[in-house]
Amino acid sequence: MSGALNMTLDEIVKRGKTARSGGRGISRGRGRGRGGGGRGAGPARRGPLAVNARPSSFTINKPVRRVRSLPWQSGLFEDGLRAAGASGVEVGTRLHVTNLDQGVTNEDIRELFSEIGEVERYAIHYDKNGRPSGTAEVVYPRRSDAFQALKKYNNVLLDGRPMRLEILGGNNSSEAPLSGRVNVNVTGLNGRLKRTVVIQQGGGGRGRVRGGRGGRGPAPTVSRRLPIHNQQGGGMRGGRGGFRARGRGNGGRGRGGGRGNGKKPVEKSAADLDKDLESYHADAMNTS
């Protein structure tokens, strides 16, 4: 400190220049040694291009997408059509069918309900194990066709079980009486099994129901008719008569006796008829 006070002004200036030149050399040397020819030590370099990125004081506001969660309300489409003046436009009407036999297929449902009118879609419901749950759903484009199907097929026996029909989303409490007689042929299992739906009023008049004569049927019935090909001899015809005897009304005189064997027809239960049907299909597959 005392030496600096004794120095002249020129010596002090010269000494300061020497100190500054020496500091620059040190910093450049350090920079070349560390960075391999860089300009010198500096802030940490970021990114693949070694660009000195400085944080900006400004922020960019990105637009946030907000999804509106509106409560679901049924019937908005129909209300919109009515508000637009299209009150005459009819939308699809869902028909729920329950108490179905497990042997009923989608093809049976289509052929049965398409006799009423155009069917928009149809499906049999299955459980988690892949077995039919005994329910189905049919959608008609026209509401009038759905009500007509309800009046004709409600409580009608299909494979020995009465179908229960209900229109979803509508008032179907008023049930109209069944028509006098309606025959609908339903073909299943690739054309080898035919079901005929015969509808009569409960306690109604006389009529033949698949080979029976003059019965007062307790409920509309569905009988099965088997084709006669792939079989020879009188055994097939006798079996055919046995299936016809299934459709007799109470108190009716059966005319479905076997024509081939000449024996008196034997009354069979629904389980026996199903077994005969399965054996017939097995024989038909073996012969084919």
Curated annotation (Swiss-Prot):
<dbReference type="GO" id="GO:0051028">
    <property type="term" value="P:mRNA transport"/>
</dbReference>
<keyword id="KW-0509">mRNA transport</keyword>
<feature type="compositionally biased region" description="Basic and acidic residues">
    <location>
        <begin position="264"/>
        <end position="281"/>
    </location>
</feature>
<dbReference type="GO" id="GO:0005654">
    <property type="term" value="C:nucleoplasm"/>
</dbReference>
<comment type="subunit">
    <text>Interacts with PARP1. Interacts with EIF4A3.</text>
</comment>
<keyword id="KW-0007">Acetylation</keyword>
<dbReference type="InterPro" id="IPR035979">
    <property type="entry name" value="RBD_domain_sf"/>
</dbReference>
<dbReference type="InterPro" id="IPR000504">
    <property type="entry name" value="RRM_dom"/>
</dbReference>
<comment type="similarity">
    <text>Belongs to the ALYREF family.</text>
</comment>
<keyword id="KW-0694">RNA-binding</keyword>
<feature type="region of interest" description="Disordered">
    <location>
        <begin position="201"/>
        <end position="288"/>
    </location>
</feature>
<feature type="modified residue" description="N-acetylserine">
    <location>
        <position position="2"/>
    </location>
</feature>
<protein>
    <recommendedName>
        <fullName>THO complex subunit 4D</fullName>
    </recommendedName>
</protein>
<feature type="region of interest" description="Disordered">
    <location>
        <begin position="1"/>
        <end position="55"/>
    </location>
</feature>
<dbReference type="Pfam" id="PF13865">
    <property type="entry name" value="FoP_duplication"/>
</dbReference>
<dbReference type="InterPro" id="IPR025715">
    <property type="entry name" value="FoP_C"/>
</dbReference>
<dbReference type="GO" id="GO:0006952">
    <property type="term" value="P:defense response"/>
</dbReference>
<feature type="compositionally biased region" description="Gly residues">
    <location>
        <begin position="232"/>
        <end position="260"/>
    </location>
</feature>
<dbReference type="GO" id="GO:0005730">
    <property type="term" value="C:nucleolus"/>
</dbReference>
<dbReference type="InterPro" id="IPR051229">
    <property type="entry name" value="ALYREF_mRNA_export"/>
</dbReference>
<keyword id="KW-0539">Nucleus</keyword>
<comment type="function">
    <text>Export adapter involved in nuclear export of spliced and unspliced mRNA. Plays a role in disease resistance. Mediates multiple defense responses triggered by NEP1, including stomatal closure, hypersensitive cell death (HCD) and defense-related gene expression.</text>
</comment>
<keyword id="KW-0813">Transport</keyword>
<feature type="domain" description="RRM">
    <location>
        <begin position="93"/>
        <end position="170"/>
    </location>
</feature>
<dbReference type="GO" id="GO:0003729">
    <property type="term" value="F:mRNA binding"/>
</dbReference>
<dbReference type="Pfam" id="PF00076">
    <property type="entry name" value="RRM_1"/>
</dbReference>
<keyword id="KW-0611">Plant defense</keyword>
<dbReference type="InterPro" id="IPR012677">
    <property type="entry name" value="Nucleotide-bd_a/b_plait_sf"/>
</dbReference>
